[in-house]
Amino acid sequence: MKINRHILTLCLLGLTLSLSAYDAVGHRIVAEIAYQNLTDKARTQVDKVLGKHGIVYEASWADEVRSDNKYAYSYQWHYQDLDDNMTSADIKHLLDNPTAEGEHLFFALDTLTARLKKDKNDAEALKFIVHLVGDLHQPLHMGRKDDKGGNKVDFNWFGKKTNLHSVWDGALIENKKMSYSEFSQYLMDKYEPKKAEFKKHNILQSVEAAYAVRNMIYSYDTSDTSNYHYVYFFADKLDEMLYRGGIQLANVLNAIYK
């Protein structure tokens, strides 16, 4: 049986998108919230560099290029291994000395922010920042080194075998059954009373908040195997991390394009 080459290409493309778009939703939510909180000047510049609403469309670009040898160096930019029982002073030390534990997430954000400040039309740096600020607010991107941020922790998710990291990368978000635009609007409405407070927070406070949730994830009572209980227990924390990510990304870009 012959299959039209163009139809086959479209089918394969659809399969690829369905496999990759799952984790893209969270990054698009963060990017959309950020876009809605940019200053007029920052929004104009971001649109100039990435195209109108390009900040949302390019939010997962940094994940997509990881398999390209050209960007192999960026693989370790997506995470920052943190030990248990770290204090605020410990975290601040790592942020102030971003190469102390290797060239990981803190290093990447520090380097890319400086790079974009130097050349405000650097599309590559901007796309990395959009994505990595999102990673900064996914608690298990600052997980334990020995379990690779939960990637080596088996998890049964409504009858499907997966891992703890994947649950937080996408499964919890997918469970909401909302598009990125619906979810981002829901979060902006939900946290409108706290927006002014969150806008005052710096990177350190964002990391501390994500680290606190990370510790909650690791200390969760695994004898309770109900996924419904898990979803309910972490619902507000998931929402808060996504919203904080969007506001912090807006803060970063507003400061660069002031």
For each of these PLM feature ranges, what is it?
Residues 16-18:
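N-terminal signal peptide c-region/cleavage motif recognized by signal peptidases
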Residues 22-132, 144-258:
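N-terminal, motif-rich segments that launch catalysis or mediate targeting to/interaction with membranes
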